[in-house]
């Protein structure tokens, strides 16, 4: 098993404090995109940190609580479906990241950002491919971003039943396609996305929509 993330990249920045930044929700067909920004205390690193996608829901929930308790500062930023439509998903993710960093109680000297795109943030940026598997700060940010977005989608399931948002969180799933074909788009669907268009087009042809 490969080793988990550590603080090597944070220390290599040569400046402090360093925040980790990561997003959640670039791929779904519905809901906002979220981003977490976390400045960890090097002396209080939660055990078990890793890429949020590699953790169980129970582990993520426990780590989210611990991260918020021990971090020097943390914040989650969002970009709405309207902003996604206006800016495109890449730049909307960057907007969510900027909001997360700007919301920190402590101004970071440096930001480690997951991926290979250097978004414009309120501090110098270093991109890290697969950063959520390498950097504790990025891993922590990925957990906060995912947990925050998952809660939004669970709430959306109660507001807009029939799509299965609580289960798939807006991603591709059979129940999601069936809901779109039967009900049409909800107010939180990303209407410009090809899978949404395709499901609606198929429903129109087959007369499946409950209008």
Curated annotation (Swiss-Prot):
Coiled-coil annotated spans: none
Cofactor(s) required, per the database record: Mn(2+); Mg(2+)
Organism: Caulobacter vibrioides (strain NA1000 / CB15N) (Caulobacter crescentus)
Cellular-component GO terms for this entry: cytoplasm; ribonuclease H2 complex
InterPro entries: RNase_HII, RNase_HII/HIII, RNase_HII/HIII_dom, RNaseH-like_sf, RNaseH_sf
Cofactor note: Manganese or magnesium. Binds 1 divalent metal ion per monomer in the absence of substrate. May bind a second metal ion after substrate binding.
Domain of life according to the entry: Bacteria
Primary location group: cytoplasm
One example of a Gene Ontology biological process annotation: mismatch repair
Segments forming domain RNase H type-2: 16-205
SUPFAM superfamilies, sorted: Ribonuclease H-like
Name by which UniProt lists this protein: Ribonuclease HII
GO molecular function: manganese ion binding; RNA binding; RNA-DNA hybrid ribonuclease activity
Record EC number: 3.1.26.4
Keyword tags: Cytoplasm, Endonuclease, Hydrolase, Manganese, Metal-binding, Nuclease
A Pfam family per the record: RNase_HII
Residue numbers binding a divalent metal cation: 22-23, 114
Function description: Endonuclease that specifically degrades the RNA of RNA-DNA hybrids.
NCBIfam families: PRK00015.1-3
Substrates-to-products reaction catalysed: Endonucleolytic cleavage to 5'-phosphomonoester
Subcellular localization: Cytoplasm
Similarity annotation: Belongs to the RNase HII family.
């Amino acid at each position: 098993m490969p080793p988990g993330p550590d603080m090597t990249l944070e220390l290599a920045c040569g400046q402090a404090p360093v925040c980790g930044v990561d997003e959640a929700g670039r791929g779904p067909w519905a809901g906002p995109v979220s981003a977490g920004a976390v400045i960890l205390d090097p002396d209080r690193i939660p055990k078990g940190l890793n890429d949020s996608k590699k953790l169980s829901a129970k582990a993520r929930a426990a780590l989210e609580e611990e991260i918020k308790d021990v971090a020097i500062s943390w914040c989650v930023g969002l970009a709405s479906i309207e902003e996604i439509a206006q800016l495109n998903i890449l730049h909307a993710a960057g907007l969510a990241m900027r909001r997360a960093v700007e919301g920190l109680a402590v101004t970071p000297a440096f930001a480690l950002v997951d991926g290979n795109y250097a978004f414009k943030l309120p501090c110098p940026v270093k991109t890290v491919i697969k950063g959520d598997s390498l950097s504790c700060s990025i891993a922590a940010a990925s957990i906060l971003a995912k947990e925050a977005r998952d809660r939004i989608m669970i709430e959306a399931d109660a507001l807009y039943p029939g799509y299965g948002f609580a289960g798939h969180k807006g991603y591709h799933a059979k129940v999601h396609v069936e809901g779109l074909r039967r009900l049409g788009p909800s107010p939180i669907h990303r209407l410009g996305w090809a899978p949404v268009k395709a499901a609606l087009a198929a429903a129109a042809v087959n007369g499946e929509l409950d209008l």
